[in-house]
Amino acid sequence: MKSTVEQAMLFEEKSIFENQAIEQGYSQVAGVDEAGRGPLAGPVVAGACILPRGKVFLGIDDSKKLTPKQRRYLYELLLEDPEVDCGVGVISVERIDEINILEATKEAMVQAIASLRSTPDFLLVDGLFLPHKVPSLKIIKGDARSVSIAAASIIAKEYRDELMRKLHVEYPEYGFDKHKGYGTAAHLQALKHFGPCVYHRKSFSPVKESIQEGVCQ
């Protein structure tokens, strides 16, 4: 585990894009990221986050690199801090099937930005060019390179995981609480046995194939 000093240095290193934007005259820099582009079931969720200038949040990193315990701690820390501005966007399975997952992801991001308390004047977006009235910078692997995007990734991931746990209560046979809708061996087996439920993405190949094979609830 990294020391406090090492974590603080890492936070500063990953603030380079935010600092550059501020040097260019921007003041409300929001990181934007998504969770749930790849799963076979459940919504796609986006997070947006504006971190206060001059405040260090130890441990902030790409949500995929954190343990569930670390991620939950940071999620609650970000939400409970009155100086942190967080927004969430959620796009349904029906909408994903209607417009495709890429466009649905962009819609979720726009929703997340709109749900922020303040209006950002610059966006740092993980991996996507986002058509938006606010100027933006696409950053490849941004969740590992920008603290604002990393914070947004934590918000999106934890929020979506909570939604999938709720879906598990409704459809326990699929194991949504464990794989969160991703195409694990156990999920594919359940899909083959039970067929898709209303929360499966019917435009995604394994789900589409199960429908074509005539497996239905």
UniProtKB/Swiss-Prot annotation:
Catalysed reactions, semicolon-separated:
Endonucleolytic cleavage to 5'-phosphomonoester
What SUPFAM superfamilies does the record tag this protein with? Ribonuclease H-like (SSF53098)
Q: Membrane-spanning regions, if any?
A: none
Which EC number(s) does UniProt give?
A: 3.1.26.4
Name the major location.
cytoplasm
Q: Which UniProt keywords are given for this protein, alphabetically ordered?
A: Cytoplasm, Endonuclease, Hydrolase, Manganese, Metal-binding, Nuclease
Give a GO biological-process term.
mismatch repair
Instruction: Identify the domain of life.
Output: Bacteria
Entries under Pfam families matching the protein: RNase_HII
Which one of the record's GO molecular function terms can you name?
RNA-DNA hybrid ribonuclease activity
Record's Gene Ontology CC terms?
cytoplasm; ribonuclease H2 complex
**Which EC class does it fall in?**
hydrolase
Every copy of the RNase H type-2 domain together lies at: 27-216
Which family does the record assign? Belongs to the RNase HII family.
Role noted for this protein: Endonuclease that specifically degrades the RNA of RNA-DNA hybrids.
What HAMAP family does the record point to? RNase_HII_B
Q: What is this protein called?
A: Ribonuclease HII
State the encoding gene: rnhB
